[in-house]
Amino acid sequence: ILIANRGEIAVRIIRACKEWGIPTVAVHSDVDRESMHVRMADESVCIGSHQPANSYLNIPALMSAIELTNSDAVHPGYGFLSENSNFARILEENKINFIGASSKHIEMMGDKIQAKKIAKENGLPVIEGSEGGVKDIGEAKKLSKKIGFPILIKASGGGGGKGMKIVYREEEFESFFSTAKSEAQKYFGNDEVYIEKFFQNPRHIEVQILAGKNRAVHL
């Protein structure tokens, strides 16, 4: 199994694989070569420079590492390419097992804008905001004024708490909008963002679901 991630999640995956007697491959950027997950894995491959776009989000480099090590499965961990339908599809096409959802389902729910659209189509209430991604800063600012501050700028491909900016005042908007787009590109390889009304100290219900080929359970 090649672990397409770093840090704590990569360490936890490697530890689980060791318990099952499964060989592991760690990938790393040039500055992560001495990281714990690299030292723990059976093999390691450098996939690029310290910028995530050049390493942990670099699909061609990851595919080369898979081929080089004859890996037959990939665990994406969380963040990075874990919700990238294109990566999952490329693995499927190359008969490499992706330890995660299918590319079809990632495409439906991994992209926050698409997920929100599907929720609305199925009659679920959603938070007030843009209908899709906003590219033009003028359009985005106009919509934010209509919704009313504070607002939240969110990366379409974001996850794990990354890719979000809270804007409390109109004069802060342009700066945060630009930062949100550049961070979305840096961390998720996609600079598309959308806007939602921000709620201070909200409560939400989260359901954890574990699914295999033939059954699914909720916790």
Q: Language-model features: where?
A:
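N-terminal beta-alpha lobe that positions the nucleotide/phosphoryl donor
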Residues: 1-219
